[in-house]
Design a protein with these regions (language model features):
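N-terminal secretory signal peptides that target proteins for export/translocation
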Residues: 1-8
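Bacterial N-terminal signal peptides
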Residues: 10-23
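Extracytoplasmic
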Residues: 28-30, 37-40, 52-54, 77, ...
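N-terminal post-signal-peptidase region of extra-cytosolic proteins
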Residues: 28-31, 55-84, 125-129, 169-174
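Soluble periplasmic/extracytoplasmic beta-strand elements of cell-envelope proteins
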Residues: 32-34, 41-43, 56, 81-83, ...
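Secreted/periplasmic proteins
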Residues: 37-41, 45, 54-69, 74, ...
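Solvent-exposed coil/turn segments that connect beta secondary-structure elements
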Residues: 38-40, 47-49, 57-62, 85-88, ...
């Protein structure tokens, strides 16, 4: 068995273990976010019930992707959790996601885009509930944020972020009343 295949198998096994321990989805009573990039809409969900709808969100200026690379301007699809909050962000308020996930990292490792050391560091960050490093080819610091002092007309008419999901400042303030650390976020 090749070293790459061995590490790939070992890492996928570890990833499945993390999913089982952390849970792949929110329980029926928890609030979670469903972000529909095609409709440019963020849904605040409780179980399978829509609680609130935020329309005209902006995504990455170059669309969406399942295999994001640093500085590509694309919003990564996937299942995340909010890991950190910056209420002093230049974007008004920033909810940081746990991107890259172990799944993103394992795929990138199998495609020779990150090293075994980088893969292991991303896994360890997830195990500890910390923000994964953004210094790999996968990038990082992906989240949900406001516009800050940006031009609201641009936000309403264009996808403008470097990969994040953006709402108006008013929308992000309203959303902040309902979500926090650990909130599940699905970007599709």
């Amino acid at each position: 068995m090749s070293m790459k295949r061995f590490f790939g198998h070992t890492m996928w096994t570890g990833f499945l273990g993390i999913l089982l321990l952390c849970g792949g989805h929110a329980s029926a009573a928890e609030l979670w976010l469903d972000i529909d990039t095609t409709k440019h809409t963020l849904y605040l969900m409780e179980g399978d019930k829509v609680v609130q709808v935020f329309e005209k969100i902006a995504i990455g200026k170059n669309g969406i992707t399942s295999d994001k690379t640093v500085h590509d301007g694309k919003t990564p699809l996937g299942h995340y959790k909010i890991r950190w909050i910056n209420d002093e962000s230049r974007f008004h308020l920033f909810f940081g996601l746990d991107y890259p996930t172990p799944e993103h990292a394992a795929t990138a490792f199998m495609e020779d885009r990150i090293s075994a050391t980088e893969l292991e560091a991303i896994y360890r960050a997830h195990e500890r509930g910390e923000e994964p490093s953004g210094s790999t080819d996968l990038g990082g610091s992906i989240g949900i944020h406001g516009v800050g002092h940006g031009d609201l007309r641009i936000h309403q008419n264009f996808d403008w972020t470097d990969g994040c999901v953006a709402l108006t400042n008013e929308q992000i303030d309203e959303l902040a009343q309902r979500i926090g650390l650990g909130t599940v976020v699905i970007v599709r």
